[in-house]
Regions:
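A short, basic N-terminal segment
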Residues: 1-53, 146-147, 399-441
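Eukaryote-specific, cytoplasm-facing alpha-helical/coiled-coil scaffolding segments in long proteins
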Residues: 67, 131-134, 250-254, 408-418
Length: 441
């Protein structure tokens, strides 16, 4: 478990009050997922040993896909990886354009010391490692040509690490960032770091200093990602883990965008093995993986990652990792862990009022309120539970055993659908023509 600070604890409870998955500290109440977490640790070990790989997290609404993806990234950072968490959106992220995907990956790039927008820090660490290596080999860091030797090593190392596949503009920008920082021109160096991260709003004057025009294109972005990956490792990190959350959003896109997005996932899966030290995690619903509107409609991808299950048994090691819904024992365990973590003014009152009998009653009422299937709405349970912790903490005479009665809050369409048991698969999905197999980057 990572070291918990008071700031982390406050972040956890503020997020849960709003129905959100916390971005850190979640390993403190990760209960009942040891086997799935162990498989993701195995994937991290593969990446650390130099493998490139991709894993799909499969689960219905409320199964904890986002939680598991964020937990995997937290574990990855604790093991020395850089990470990035990207949410698929039909408004903000056009998944069929890899320059969009690359830009979001770079914006969300983080490490244990720099949680977001970490490319500048990673570059500094890599350049520092090069300077230290040159000094260790006998070079004089005060010599007039020392910076030129660093610049040449940047070029040589990028060519060696990427097998010559890093675009020349990528190399020139990295070298120019180094030059500008040595000159004290932090503003233009920062602008070029933004360009390297996929920004399309960098001034022409800054780009001119690196001898580049235009922006990173969709067809170039995969090669840029290869360069970034190698710099991440050269900076001392074990590798890079990228989580793509809510891939089922692709199902709501226009047909042409949906087809291109599915082919984009296929291209990522096809290329994954050649990106040594990179682990992709992609979350999605069974509908996304199993219908002809989704992965099942694109035969080359479906054949590679099709979910295999015999009765109630499924291997954790196959391409799709199945996440199971919450059950009553798991809810009780999570509630007890949250009670332990809660930053109460009077911990004894919390333990006395939010008792084991009250937790058991709340779990039972929630389960009954949702037709015996609490697994579809853990968000509601956790919000209700944290609210009871707050009520006891704030009001000395409040007793939840006598004052509180569970009433389901307004449900989202996804929750209504999950509880009703209605199939999400539409006639259109069943009649969907096969997705054309094409390279779109």
């Amino acid at each position: 478990m990572s070291t918990m600070t008071n700031r982390d604890v406050q972040h956890i409870f503020e997020s849960l009050r709003k129905g959100l998955v916390p971005e850190r500290g979640i390993d403190a109440f990760a209960e009942g997922i040891e086997k799935m977490r162990g498989e993701l640790h195995r994937q991290l070990d593969l990446a650390r040993s130099g493998e490139g790989t991709i894993k799909f997290l499969r689960g219905g609404y409320g199964c904890g896909k986002t939680f598991m993806a964020r937990l995997a990234l937290l574990d990855a950072q604790n093991k020395g990886f850089a990470t990035s968490f990207v949410v698929v959106s039909d408004n903000d992220l056009r998944f069929h354009r890899f320059d969009d995907v690359y830009r979001k990956v770079m914006i969300e790039l983080g490490t244990s010391v720099c949680p977001r927008g970490a490319m500048g820090d990673i570059l500094d660490r890599w350049i520092g490692n090069i300077e230290e290596a040159l000094v260790a080999s006998g070079e004089d860091e005060d010599a007039s040509d020392f910076d030129q030797k660093v610049r040449k090593r940047l070029d040589d190392d990028l060519a060696s690490m990427t097998g010559g596949q890093a675009p020349q503009d990528f190399v020139r920008v990295v070298q120019t960032i180094f030059d500008l920082k040595q000159q004290g021109n932090v503003a233009d160096a920062g602008a070029l770091i933004s360009w390297l991260c996929g920004s399309g709003n960098v001034a022409a004057a800054a780009k001119k200093q690196a001898g580049i025009k235009g922006d990173i294109t969709s067809r170039d972005a995969l090669d840029y990602l290869r360069g970034v990956l190698e710099i991440v490792k050269a900076a001392g990190y074990k590798g890079l883990v990228i989580a793509i959350d809510e891939a089922e959003t692709i199902l709501r896109m226009r047909r042409d965008s949906r087809h291109k997005s599915l082919n984009g996932i296929r291209q990522i899966a096809d290329a994954a093995g050649s990106y040594k030290g990179l682990l992709w995690l992609v979350t999605g619903t069974p509908e996304f993986f199993d219908t002809r509107q989704g992965v099942a409609g694109l035969a080359p991808l479906h054949e590679r990652i099709q979910f295999l299950k015999q009765g109630r048994f499924a291997s954790l090691r196959q391409a799709q990792l199945e996440l199971t819904p919450f059950d009553q024992p798991r809810l009780r365990s999570v509630a007890m862990r949250l009670r332990e973590l809660y930053p109460a003014a009077n911990p004894n009152r919390i333990d006395d009022r939010i008792s084991q009998p009250f937790i058991d009653r709340l779990v039972e009422e929630v389960t009954t309120g949702f037709k015996g299937d609490v697994g579809v709405v853990p968000r509601q349970f956790l919000r209700q539970f944290v609210n009871q912790l707050d009520m006891v903490d704030e009001h000395e005479d409040y007793d939840p055993m006598t004052e509180y009665g569970f009433r389901p809050a307004e449900l989202s369409p996804e929750e209504e659908q999950a509880i009703s048991g209605l199939q999400t698969r539409s006639q259109e999905a069943d009649e969907e023509a096969p997705v054309p197999n094409e390279d779109i980057w």
